[in-house]
């Protein structure tokens, strides 16, 4: 039996909506594909029921009570659907803390949860509550005392037969002007090691192939458009190959994301956020999964934000959360046998 924690995210947004929708969809299947999973929903119980009522799933949610566990956490203030309130900023972090604590081993070496899946949060609300917050990825790393983690997004490409595209990032939430200085030999070495290790241990890939982008247009054009490729990125690829990692590149980012090159790749390592995620989200938005590599536990999330205007309307799509749940279960199963 696997135990999967799901945090419901920003209470004024669609997190509660898509959590209810996704879990009911899974539980209603004639032959549930995750019959060996116990779901642990972390959030305010009354809010979840109220949101289920609002989107026409109230009775079904009540009936599902025996099939899942609601790990109740009280709101900081009453919620107005679609309206942010800094009084609930610490509530959102409380949900994350409960999931993190449950995923980390206790004194006996046992963890309550095998993986955590996170609904979207509103960074501004948390910061307005007086807590500096850059994003899930950085917060999870800090709370788990993990020195380096890697953000990777994955999703099926409908235009290419639903082939899976995975894109990891050497840097995450940085202003663009700071990216070149952040791409150091140590960062690239650590990132490639983490990507290789987790693709093997949590995705079951024996020898993952990683394609590495350049930083500059045309991968620097032999140094005429920047020297990061020559001085930092290509040497990192050479070192990775010497460590047994099947890394290749650097490739010009504007031509890398095409079927001919991606056909034999298990993952792309991009140098910065929009370089890697713009092409991925173009083909997968609404069905992509955000994965944090390098943590001592499995964590996945959605590829979208809180969509305040859709909260409580019944129009929020749960596709990305379902993909995140499926991915978390798959990763947890591989991790259990690695």
From Swiss-Prot:
An example Gene Ontology CC term for this record: cytoplasm
Pathway annotation from the record: Cofactor biosynthesis; pyridoxine 5'-phosphate biosynthesis; pyridoxine 5'-phosphate from D-erythrose 4-phosphate: step 4/5
Localization terms from the record: Cytoplasm
SUPFAM superfamilies with a match to the protein in the record: Isocitrate/Isopropylmalate dehydrogenase-like (SSF53659)
A GO BP annotation: pyridoxine biosynthetic process
Spans through the membrane: none
Organism superkingdom: Bacteria
Binding site for a divalent metal cation: 173, 218, 273
Details of cofactor binding: Binds 1 divalent metal cation per subunit. Can use ions such as Zn(2+), Mg(2+) or Co(2+).
Keywords tagged on the record: Cobalt, Cytoplasm, Magnesium, Metal-binding, NAD, NADP, Oxidoreductase, Pyridoxine biosynthesis, Zinc
Stored InterPro entries: PdxA, PdxA_fam
Required cofactor(s): Zn(2+); Mg(2+); Co(2+)
Reaction catalysed by this enzyme: 4-(phosphooxy)-L-threonine + NAD(+) = 3-amino-2-oxopropyl phosphate + CO2 + NADH
Binding site for substrate: 136-137, 281, 290, 299
Stored Pfam families: PdxA
GO MF assignments: 4-hydroxythreonine-4-phosphate dehydrogenase activity; cobalt ion binding; magnesium ion binding; NAD binding; zinc ion binding
Known EC number: 1.1.1.262
Note: The active site is located at the dimer interface.
Job description of the protein: Catalyzes the NAD(P)-dependent oxidation of 4-(phosphooxy)-L-threonine (HTP) into 2-amino-3-oxo-4-(phosphooxy)butyric acid which spontaneously decarboxylates to form 3-amino-2-oxopropyl phosphate (AHAP).
Family per similarity comment: Belongs to the PdxA family.
Subunit structure: Homodimer.
Stated name of the protein: 4-hydroxythreonine-4-phosphate dehydrogenase
Organism: Ralstonia nicotianae (strain ATCC BAA-1114 / GMI1000) (Ralstonia solanacearum)
Taxonomic lineage from the root: Bacteria, Pseudomonadati, Pseudomonadota, Betaproteobacteria, Burkholderiales
